[in-house]
């Protein structure tokens, strides 16, 4: 109930005919609003590690509510800082533009600036060998890239990886629609919510521009 983009990454077929094991890896948005029932459910899944990609400020504002017995691992990635002023201006109806293109530029830092963090993430998964959940705030950009390189590393085809990335739009549709209605209302109908929608979801161009670069797809990520 307290998350909008939580799902398992098991069951995908790999290029060598195997399948990604069920009950091992989960991706999510922030865990700051989970209920007691949610926490009990997470415990029932056998999750042992929670990996948080959020910045210090994000974690301070919305600390995770993690069940006892789970290890909390912090791998912070600053995200969207450069485009936040423009987003806020658009929410007030004071600016226009292609937020999707801005997000492409912001996400490019996952490769150019935070490659070491993602390498640490993959090494953590490999070394721990325990059921793990990883997340950022919305569970779509930082966590979405983490899911993509993990699936690629175990041999899941690129097309399947992209399809998993795009599932965020299905999982978050109701939440995003409601949120954008509120923005429209609070801005006295000045905000162009169609301009804002790209930053609330995902588009193929967001992930393709990362996965088809030599840096993102090379052996240093695949492990």
Regions found by a protein language model. Give the residues of each.
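Catalytic-loop region of hydrolases
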Residues: 1-22, 33-49
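Short, cationic motifs built from Arg/Lys/His that form the positively charged side of catalytic pockets
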Residues: 7, 24-27, 54, 142, ...
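Conserved beta-strand segments of alpha/beta enzyme cores
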Residues: 24, 71-73, 160
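Cysteine-based protein phosphatase catalytic domain of the PTP/DSP
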Residues: 28-126
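Cysteine-dependent PTP/DSP-like catalytic domain, specifically the C-terminal lobe
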Residues: 116-134, 144-211
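Substrate/cofactor-recognition hotspot
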Residues: 139
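Single conserved hydrophobic/aromatic residue that forms the stacking wall/gate
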Residues: 212-223
